[in-house]
Amino acid sequence: MPRIVGGIAAFVVCLAAGSATSALAQSNDPLGVGRKLLAEDNPGDLWVERGKRVFYEQRGPKRASLEKCDFGLGPGKLEGAYARMPRYFPDTDKVQDAESRLVTCMVDLQGFNRVEIAKTAMGTLDRMSDIEALAAYVASKSNGMKMDVPLSHQKEYDTYKAGEYIFFRRNGPTDFGCITCHGENSKRIRLQDLPNMTDRQQLQAVVSTWPAYLGTQSNLRTMQWRLKICYWQMRLPDLPYLSDVTVAITSYLNYQGNGAVIGVPGVKR
């Protein structure tokens, strides 16, 4: 099934590229044309549908679904929950993003092992990730809503400030930080334009469209994956899955993106 899904997604990418040929010659943003065409038949929707099925499936040692998972608005209430994350959860006494909250519920409600979950959290060409699919489904339930990440709890504020510090801090063997690539307009790596995350409009366009389908990966990815890869590209120490660092950076970026209308899954290169 995963190979078939990957093949279908790749075929859709090729169709979109072919359909965009004439438009590319006239556009200043050829990759944007492709993304727009893909969004009409988004391969990422396959992950959303899988996530919906997995969410309601009786799974794990406890043979339970995730219908009692509380994403901040009450057990089982998904509409608008993603728009307010990361946020503080009293039961864990932590600020959590959607993925870390999903893992908490999979452990507590379904009896899964946290370490084992992390081993298969990121999908491959041969295997779709349940976590990535679940994150896409939960996020999709906030589509059309504005991001409204809170800072009302002290730990929410502390996490936000930690994320802000990390975003602007340069370190490691290359003296890189998030700000190195995402602090100015008109930067790019090969074919990839780099958004200026100090520009509110550009930042909102980014944070409101993750999780996203990546054509180069033939897979759907989450912000946890994106930040992990950023750290790898900066030659910094590997970030463990659901690291406090990734949650902190996500908290900073999502709060800065408040007011952006969510539309997931996005489509990226």
Please give the residue ranges for each predicted region.
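Electron-transfer interface patches adjacent to heme c in soluble/periplasmic c-type cytochromes
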Residues: 25-46, 57-71, 75-133, 143-144, ...
